[in-house]
From Swiss-Prot:
Active site: H362
Subunit relationships: Homotrimer.
Name of the molecule in the record: Bifunctional protein GlmU
Cofactors, names only: Mg(2+)
Cell compartment(s), UniProt: Cytoplasm
Catalytic activity: alpha-D-glucosamine 1-phosphate + acetyl-CoA = N-acetyl-alpha-D-glucosamine 1-phosphate + CoA + H(+); N-acetyl-alpha-D-glucosamine 1-phosphate + UTP + H(+) = UDP-N-acetyl-alpha-D-glucosamine + diphosphate
Transmembrane segments: none
Length: 458
């Protein structure tokens, strides 16, 4: 049987108190809507429709290529939101999943199990329910004396007895598709909110003698719908625990999982060790046998096997096998370290490529440079690459030796096996195997110190 999906992503999210549409707030580095769409994609769906409304264009811009969407111009309730997908789905034979775009913790496995249960029960509608420790705010599942689902009552419409019920509606359903759109034409706004409730179709199905089933979630956390920043932080915490657990199961050592923040799209190889207070964000790849020490931050980068990142920041950069950085180094966007490169204390590199075996041990800035193999940068070296308007490139060939406190005024080229003397200001190209000296000659004025303000006598 064909499977379809409708993802509800039209709400404003007033309680978030944000200019950003609610479904675009991020959990573990990915929007809540993207998490939901990922889970839906794990089920074999013939057609997926996203309902957009508030800030529709911003939401549409984030959708995967080819995703179908419908704009809900007026937000008149969940029933209305589903009904406007009629032109795309109403005539289809099959079962339709309806899910909210602010439920980032729900998994593809749960959705697959929900479809299986729906088909096994030969149901017209199947509700994904959960037993809530505190059901306040959720719609309650009302069952009859035989335990069958009778209806769903929203919090604002519930009486005291109904409010005491702990089985709640998670807001995720599967419906027989044609029955769903037929019932949606019968619902009204006669309720406390004055909206078209999707849940009202359940009572319509029951009155028609159709089967309404309920599948209870094993993990209540999956049911979390995010309506404010408090719930967002709860979703972040739960997702982070889930991500960290999976990495540890896969052979990664996390010294302190409670202070380790790993985004959902990060890949990490076996035998890698990650110490406390580490953040790894975005689309980052980390290979095998990597050491990442306390306080490091890595974002949208590739760190290949046998590398070390010691208390450093790596952004949009690539570290090849056996390279190491830190402590207190900063690889800025566009940096590429070849194999066995060493970047040490308080070194900053931006938009540069360093060849195999090159070393910049301390207190160095390298920007917009192409550096060959086994080049050595002395402490205090900088490439002066910016004139206030334009950035300029520096080229340094294999085996060059850059003396401490050299200032390299780009654009220029330093040749193979060339050497710059300590303290030089390099303003011209340096040929292969040349020694460059670009500093004033030292002169000692004997006895002159006695006339200087600092002098304290014998």
């Amino acid at each position: 049987m064909n499977k379809f999906a409708i993802v509800l992503a039209a709400g404003k999210g007033t309680r978030m108190k944000s200019a950003l549409p609610k479904v675009l707030h991020q959990v573990a580095g990915k929007s809540m809507l993207a998490h939901v769409l990922t889970s839906v994609s794990e089920v074999e769906i013939a057609k997926n429709v996203v309902i957009v409304g508030h800030e529709a264009d911003r939401v549409i811009a984030t959708l995967p290529k080819g995703t179908q969407f419908v704009k809900q111009v007026e937000q008149l309730g969940t029933g209305h939101a589903v009904r406007i997908a009629a032109d795309l789905l109403a005539n289809e034979d099959g079962a339709t999943l309806v899910i909210a775009g602010d439920t980032p913790l729900i998994t593809g496995q749960t959705l697959e199990a929900l479809f299986d249960y729906h088909f096994a029960q030969n149901a017209t509608a199947t509700i994904l329910t959960a037993i809530a420790p505190n059901p306040t705010g959720y719609g309650r599942i009302i069952r009859d004396e035989n335990g069958s689902v009778e209806k769903i009552v929203e919090q604002k419409d519930a009486n005291d007895f109904e409010k005491s019920i702990t089985e709640i509606n998670t807001g995720t359903y599967i419906f027989d598709n044609k029955s769903l759109f037929k019932a949606l034409n019968e619902i009204t706004t006669d309720n406390a909110q004055g909206e078209y409730y999707l849940t009202d179709v359940i009572e319509i199905f029951k009155k028609a003698g159709q089967t309404v089933a309920a599948h209870i979630l094993d993990d209540f956390d999956e049911s979390l719908g995010v309506n404010d920043r408090v719930a967002l932080s709860q979703a972040e915490l739960t997702m982070r625990k889930r991500i960290n657990h999976q990495h540890m199961v896969n052979g990664v050592t996390l010294i302190d999982p409670a202070t380790t923040y790993i985004d959902s799209e990060v890949t990490i190889g076996e035998e890698t060790v990650i110490e406390a207070n580490v953040t790894i964000k975005g689309n980052t790849f980390i290979g095998k046998n990597v050491l990442i020490t306390n306080g490091s931050r890595i974002e949208n980068s590739e760190i290949h096997s046998n590398c070390e990142v010691r208390n450093s920041t790596v952004e949009e950069s690539r570290m090849s096998v056996g390279s190491n950085v830190g402590p207190y180094a900063h690889l800025r966007p566009g940096t590429v370290l070849s194999e066995e490169v060493h970047v040490g204390n308080f070194v900053e590199i931006k938009g540069s490529t360093l060849g195999k075996g090159t070393k910049a041990g301390h207190l160095t800035y390298i920007g917009n440079a192409t550096v060959g193999e086994k080049v050595n940068f002395g402490a205090g070296t900088i490439t002066a690459n910016f004139d206030g308007k334009n950035k300029f490139n520096t080229e340094i060939d294999d085996f060059a030796f850059i003396g401490s406190n050299s200032t390299i005024i780009a654009p220029l080229h330093i040749g193979k096996n060339a050497l710059t003397a300590a303290g030089s200001v390099v303003t011209e190209d340096v040929p292969d195997e040349a020694v460059e000296i670009g500093r004033g000659k030292q002169v000692n004025k004997l006895g002159r110190a006695k006339k200087m303000p600092h002098y304290r006598g014998q």
